[in-house]
Amino acid sequence: MEKLYSENEGMASNQGKMENEEQPQDERKPEVTCTLEDKKLENEGKTENKGKTGDEEMLKDKGKPESEGEAKEGKSEREGESEMEGGSEREGKPEIEGKPESEGEPGSETRAAGKRPAEDDVPRKAKRKTNKGLAHYLKEYKEAIHDMNFSNEDMIREFDNMAKVQDEKRKSKQKLGAFLWMQRNLQDPFYPRGPREFRGGCRAPRRDIEDIPYV
């Protein structure tokens, strides 16, 4: 009996030892499993971080060429504007540089202008117009009136106006002649004068310095 009891106790102790040994092993296993899960999570986090960093780097790399392309386009536009401005300035410079040559010519032009009379400065067309007198214009107007569709009254009225113009011209000529006559009398005291200071009539002979008696 004692042997059986001792054997039973030995079996119980062995079972207790086995259970105690199995329990810590079982307890350690969850830790191992936890550590494995943590490692997996860490690896996944690392991969996510790596993916994020890779995406960010890709975006940065994509953004850089765009910014570089914009910078290049801006530079090309600025260079084009500078070239345009430089070309315009270069085109404007030859005109300015050509001025000294044109400035050297005014001396010869002024000399030629000094030799020419003042009438040569008037254009030829203007000369032709000014050379025509009032009588010529009236004659042309008379010829043109016949071609116009005027009634008899209008024709008579136009001819009357033309006659008035001719009379005014004649009177103005007489006034100018009298004015010139007065100036001539004032300038030359020995100019022959008629009665009542009118031109013509009985004129006294002109007396020169030789005819004045010596006193």
From Swiss-Prot:
Q: InterPro entries under this entry? A: TF_A-like/BEX
Q: Which residues carry this modification: N-acetylmethionine?
A: M1
What residue stretch is flagged as signal peptide?
none
Q: What is its main location?
A: nucleus
- Record bears the keyword Phosphoprotein: yes
For region Disordered, the annotated ranges are: 1-133
Q: Its GO CC terms?
A: nucleus
Q: What name does UniProt use for this protein?
A: Transcription elongation factor A protein-like 4
What is the organism of origin for this protein?
Answer: Homo sapiens
User: What broad taxonomic lineage does this protein's source fall under?
Assistant: Eukaryota, Metazoa, Chordata, Craniata, Vertebrata
